[in-house]
Amino acid sequence: MMFLAAAVVLFGVDATDTKRPYIEPIAIVERRGARTQFSPPDADDKKAFAREYFGGKRYEMFSSGERIGTALAESPLELSCVSLAAGVKLSKPLPYSLGLATSGPLIAQHRDTVREVTRDEKAAMERLLRDQLSIELTPDVSIVAADFDHDGRPEFVANGVVKSGRTEHQFLVIATEHRGRMRTQYIYDHRKAVETDGDQARLEWFDQADIDDDGVDEIIARVHDYEGWSWRILKRTRRTWKIVYSGGGGGC
C-alpha cells in the first residue's frame, strides 16, 4: 500500500525527438483516503511552476509501470504558443521513447508487461476492427499486448489513423481475448471527412501505470487536435474503461 504525503506531479516524458527530449506535467495527483483526485497544472503561472519543478530537479522515471532510471528536468522550453515544459536529460533511454516521471511516490511499480502480438492475436484484432469500425489494418496501426491487471492474461490495444473511403478514422480500441475471439472494452473512434482540414482529435496511447494503487494500471493518453494537445487518464472499472481526467497540454 502506498500513501501520498502531498500532491504529486505526474509528468510525461517524450524522447521521440532524440535531439529535443522534453518533460511536461500531465496532472497533479492527490490521494484522499480511497479516492484519487486529478487536477490540471496551472499553466497561467509558468514561472512559479518552472521554479518549483524545473531547473535541475531530478525525478524517478517509469516505462509501462517499471522504474527504469531518472529524468533531470532542465530549463523551460516552448513547445507551442501556450505550453508548460522543459528540456530533459535521461539517465538511460526510454524503451518506447515515451514514459512517465513523478515528483514523489505515486506509481505502484511492476515489470513491463508490454509485448508484440502474435500472428493469431493480430488476425483476431484485425477481424475486430473490421467488424466494429469497418476498417482494414495498415502499417501505421499499432497493436500491442499489455497485462493491465497483472492476471497473466493480456489486453490488446490498437491505435492509429486509417482512411476508409472518404472517411478517416482516428481510433483507439482496447480488447480482451475470449475463446479465440476479441471482445471490446473501450472504443474511441473520431471520424472525419478525408477532404476536411482541421477536424482532428487523435487519441494516442502514451503509457500505462498503476496510479491509484488498486492493482490495475491506468492508461495515460494524449489527444492531438488541430491546434494543440491535451492529456487523458483512462481507468478500468470492471470490464470497461472510462476517462477520469482531461487536462494539461498546450497549443496555439
Predicted feature locations:
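Sec-dependent N-terminal signal peptides
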Residues: 1-9
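Beta-propeller-forming repeat regions
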Residues: 9-252
